Amino acid sequence: MALKKEGPEFDHDDEVLLLEPGIMLDESSADEQPSPRATPKATTSFSSKQHKHIDYTRALDATQLYLNEIGFSPLLTPEEEVHFARLAQKGDPAGRKRMIESNLRLVVKIARRYVNRGLSLLDLIEEGNLGLIRAVEKFDPERGFRFSTYATWWIRQTIERAIMNQTRTIRLPIHVVKELNVYLRAARELTHKLDHEPSPEEIANLLEKPVAEVKRMLGLNERVTSVDVSLGPDSDKTLLDTLTDDRPTDPCELLQDDDLSESIDQWLTELTDKQREVVIRRFGLRGHESSTLEEVGQEIGLTRERVRQIQVEALKRLREILEKNGLSSDALFQ
């Protein structure tokens, strides 16, 4: 099948971020198309001098290198797009690869809209690329519309989902995330129209929703901080270390706990080595964590059933020790 090599035609919705190979990205030129007269020779000439202009210690280096690399992937004409989409639909790896590589700049264009939302640009691009791959897998070229229009929805969805999941401590169900995005989009729309941040009442009026429901949904967007987070890069203390325990502690209870611990240690000495080892590991004594029968067996080299038998023997022996000392075993073995 002969393919035309004419330049691609895009409508407004099909615009992509065009980046000439080897050209540095800045805010003023990021969305400009490359000159059709650019030649590999000019690119090579720039390459020989680029070390004078790029500071490789900057965090943007990786992003710039990625953008330069994807600039070598040519865009597809409408005819080529249909051709390679059909190949991808049939499971052809080459067709799938060409569809993905030719639309990587579309992902960058969309990802840049979500900068300063909690994820770096590279992370946003990575998530968007997952959406692009999904779009290639689901796209039907016989439907008659351009791939970029179809892929935009998948790319935006994966990016927005990643922002919601990765920037919050508590993850929300996906249906709640989708509903919350409706409220957040309404808030952004009102922010552009008004001279102030919209109130829940204004958002409720726009969406025709109850004010209480708007407040509830927006409350889900509040950041939650872990109490284990460090107070600073040079500090070993966490937020938990600065919180006071408001629960009253009875000194008598502390003494009773200490006495009980000493008594248990004494009683354990009257068990056999195997019995003592099983009880300590099963019930989390002497600094160990509680373990299952199978875990204890793996740790001491016995079968699960043998560990169970030793545990039964050990507990029976402990009850006898308690009764001999005039104590009830009920409280200890509840």
Curated annotation (Swiss-Prot):
Region annotation (Sigma-70 factor domain-2) ranges: 99-169
An example Gene Ontology molecular-function term: sigma factor activity
DNA damage is among the record's keywords: no
Listed Gene3D superfamilies: RNA Polymerase Primary Sigma Factor, Winged helix-like DNA-binding domain superfamily/Winged helix DNA-binding domain
Record-level GO BP terms: DNA-templated transcription initiation; negative regulation of secondary metabolite biosynthetic process; positive regulation of chemotaxis; positive regulation of single-species biofilm formation on inanimate substrate; regulation of cell motility; regulation of cellular response to heat; regulation of cellular response to oxidative stress; regulation of DNA-templated transcription
Motif (Interaction with polymerase core subunit RpoC): 123-126
UniProt xrefs under InterPro entries: RNA_pol_sigma-70_dom (IPR014284), RNA_pol_sigma70 (IPR000943), RNA_pol_sigma70_r1_2 (IPR009042), RNA_pol_sigma70_r2 (IPR007627), RNA_pol_sigma70_r3 (IPR007624), RNA_pol_sigma70_r4 (IPR007630), RNA_pol_sigma_r2 (IPR013325), RNA_pol_sigma_r3/r4-like (IPR013324)
Origin superkingdom: Bacteria
Region (Sigma-70 factor domain-1): 61-94
Subcellular location: Cytoplasm
Keywords: Cytoplasm, DNA-binding, Sigma factor, Transcription, Transcription regulation
UniProt DNA-binding region: 293-312
Sequence segments annotated as region (Disordered): 21-50
Any single GO CC term annotated in Swiss-Prot or TrEMBL for this entry: cytoplasm
Database matches in PANTHER family: RNA POLYMERASE SIGMA FACTOR RPO, RNA POLYMERASE SIGMA FACTOR RPOS
Function in brief: Sigma factors are initiation factors that promote the attachment of RNA polymerase to specific initiation sites and are then released. This sigma factor is the master transcriptional regulator of the stationary phase and the general stress response.
HAMAP family in the cross-refs: Sigma70_RpoS (MF_00959)
Quaternary structure note: Interacts with the RNA polymerase core enzyme.
Protein name (record): RNA polymerase sigma factor RpoS
Gene: rpoS
